[in-house]
Swiss-Prot record:
Membrane protein topology class: Peripheral membrane protein
The keyword Lipid biosynthesis is annotated on this UniProt entry: yes
Cellular component GO terms, alphabetical: cytoplasm; extrinsic component of plasma membrane
Protein name: UDP-2,3-diacylglucosamine hydrolase
Sequence similarity: Belongs to the LpxH family.
Binding site for Mn(2+) 2: D41, N79, H114, H195
Pathway noted in the entry: Glycolipid biosynthesis; lipid IV(A) biosynthesis; lipid IV(A) from (3R)-3-hydroxytetradecanoyl-[acyl-carrier-protein] and UDP-N-acetyl-alpha-D-glucosamine: step 4/6
EC number: 3.6.1.54
Compartments where located: Cell inner membrane
InterPro entries for the chain: Calcineurin-like_PHP_ApaH, LpxH-like, Metallo-depent_PP-like, UDP-diacylglucosamine_Hdrlase
Organism annotation: Proteus mirabilis (strain HI4320)
Length: 240
């Protein structure tokens, strides 16, 4: 048996192929796992659990079916879907996790997170992140009518895409010292995250000992997952 990790699907009604690929992944791969962990940016944006988007309902039903088949699903918020709350979690059968979580799987000790907190060189993004994760601001936003929330979300997304065009690749990637500090803070040999859309396994030397940072790819043209078994941790890219 295995444990699976995915991130950065950016599910949207405008990308039906990705949705179909994810549903096929649940039926053909996740169904055979011990557990499924989704490490953020599951949806392209999220304006509240009260959004009656049919896609959200379809995904919730598929995840609940997975849970009913004996495979639990766990979720860490990303920068696109940080407003997913207890209502959707209940409807989908997902368990919401904190922004960092240490797992003990067989002999592996693994830290999981979305990954945006590691990108400390991007000062503008970190300021934005601090604002939108403010609970008071979130409560105010969720009090707005859905139409206004949707308008704000689309405007923020457009602004983010425009801003990122002028940022260097290095700024939008993780900061090496932030990675080392995080490894030391949580005392793990492995870290798995998403966010940067740069699938790879990096070896990080800390005090003469190897540590491993696994990065999930985004589901743009193919699927990406980490598969953890008793004897290995592997990054797998696969067609939809």
């Amino acid at each position: 048996m295995c444990t699976l990790f995915i991130a950065d699907l950016h599910l949207s009604e405008h990308e039906p192929a990705i949705t179909a690929g994810f549903l096929r992944f649940l039926q053909e791969q996740a169904i055979h796992a011990n557990a499924l962990y989704i490490l953020g940016d599951f949806f392209d944006f999220w304006i509240g659990d009260d959004d009656p988007n049919p896609l959200h309902q379809r995904i919730a039903q598929a995840l609940m079916a997975l849970k009913n088949a004996g495979v639990p699903c766990y979720f860490i918020h990303g920068n696109r879907d940080f407003l997913i709350g207890s209502r959707f979690a209940k409807e989908s059968g997902m368990t919401l996790l904190p922004q960092e979580k240490v797992l003990e799987i067989e002999q592996h000790r693994i830290l999981i997170l979305h990954g945006d907190t590691l990108c400390t060189d991007d000062d503008a993004y970190q300021r934005y992140r601090k604002k939108v994760h403010n609970k008071f601001i979130q409560r105010l936003f969720l009090l707005l009518p859905l139409t206004i929330r949707l308008r704000i979300a689309k405007k923020m997304r457009s602004r983010s895409q425009s801003s990122n065009q002028y940022k260097s690749e290095a700024i939008m990637d993780v900061n090496a010292q932030a990675v080392i500090n995080t490894f030391k803070q949580f005392n793990t040999q492995w870290m798995i995250h998403g966010h940067t859309h740069r699938p790879a396994i990096h070896t990080v030397d800390i005090d003469g000992k190897p540590h491993y940072r696994g990065v999930l790819g985004a589901w743009h043209t193919e699927g990406s997952m980490f598969k953890v078994t008793s004897d290995k941790i592997e990054l797998i890219q696969f067609p939809f």
